[in-house]
């Protein structure tokens, strides 16, 4: 299990469940260091004053937003009160939460293995899973307060930070959002979707880009020559006859 990022209590009503927060995902991306191509030496980042051309010590760095300069002390006035509690404010149907609102995923795990802690954790997870509801609450991580949704995944409590409503763009102005469609085209499109439908199997989808990068690194390490493959022609032109295209697509899946 990943290291704990936060330790506190999950609070609902008069019940407090001691929990730890751990990341539910791991970063498998390849991270490259920047080097000077001339001598392969690492590149260093320096904070330089654009007027003086000199490096600025960290303690002399201020912050500006929209023309207003603020000190660290002034910025700290917005910091939320640090607490060790995730306060559940309400329960909602999980299906009602638009996936666009989900941000970063974590797991909540029992903080300790005492009988009372495990029983309370198991009770909450079981009831939430049975009711198909998610808990909404807030908590402070480091110096920022987050809105969170807590749901059940394979018997464990999974916490996702949520984006606030004004961070999610609406669909106004998107061509094709809403409007009328032709019944015959809808019927054929439904058939095509059904032909392509399958069960969700995450193991069936790999990060092909990362695999190609790893293969390039292995080949370069062995002294091989790296050549960029020819790209497949992109299909960017609109379909002149949508109905004909749907029917032709269905034939390939018949």
For each predicted feature, which ranges?
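Boundary segments of small protein-protein interaction reader/adaptor domains
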Residues: 1-254
